[in-house]
Amino acid sequence: MPAGVSWGQYLKFLGCALASMMAGSQAVHLYYKPLEDLRVYIEQEQHSTQVDPTAKPPESA
């Protein structure tokens, strides 16, 4: 194993790292609610990027 660590220690660390990553992700989603207004954000971006199909590209200098 890496750095002379036993399989047991390696798997224990891996499990703890995975659990803390999941707990942190869940905490972010419960506290900040990043997906709550996702639909509104997507609609705003779609409306702000709509282009007139008859528009001509700018002329280069």
From Swiss-Prot:
Distribution of this protein across tissues and organs: Expressed in the brain.
Predominant localisation class: mitochondrion
GO molecular function: protein-containing complex binding
Mitochondrial intermembrane membrane side: 33-61
Similarity remark: Belongs to the UQCC6 family.
Gene Ontology CC annotation, any one: mitochondrial inner membrane
Nucleotidyltransferase found in the keyword field: no
Subunit text: Interacts with sloth1; the interaction stabilizes both components.
Membrane-spanning ranges: 10-32
Protein name: Ubiquinol-cytochrome c reductase complex assembly factor 6
Topology, Mitochondrial matrix side: 1-9
Knockout-associated phenotype: Adult lethal, mainly due to flies becoming stuck in the food medium post eclosion. Rare escaper adult flies have slow motor activity, reduced climbing ability and short scutellar bristles. Larval motor neurons and adult photoreceptors have a reduced ability to maintain a synaptic response upon repeated stimulation. Impaired mitochondrial function in larvae.
Entry's localization field: Mitochondrion inner membrane; Mitochondrion
InterPro entries in the record: BRAWNIN (IPR027858)
GO BP annotations, alphabetical order: mitochondrial respiratory chain complex III assembly
Membrane topology: Single-pass membrane protein
Keywords: Membrane, Mitochondrion, Mitochondrion inner membrane, Transmembrane, Transmembrane helix
Function: Required for the assembly and stability of the mitochondrial ubiquinol-cytochrome c reductase complex (complex III (CIII) or cytochrome b-c1 complex), a multisubunit transmembrane complex that is part of the mitochondrial electron transport chain (ETC) which drives oxidative phosphorylation.
Taxonomic lineage: Eukaryota, Metazoa, Ecdysozoa, Arthropoda, Hexapoda
Note: Expressed from one of two small open reading frames (smORFs) encoded by a bicistronic transcript. The ORF for sloth1 has a non-canonical Kozak sequence while the ORF for sloth2 has a classical optimal Kozak sequence. Both ORFs are expressed because ribosomes occasionally fail to initiate translation of sloth1 and continue scanning to initiate translation of sloth2, a process known as 'leaky scanning'. The 'sloth' peptides were named for the slow movement phenotype of mutant flies.
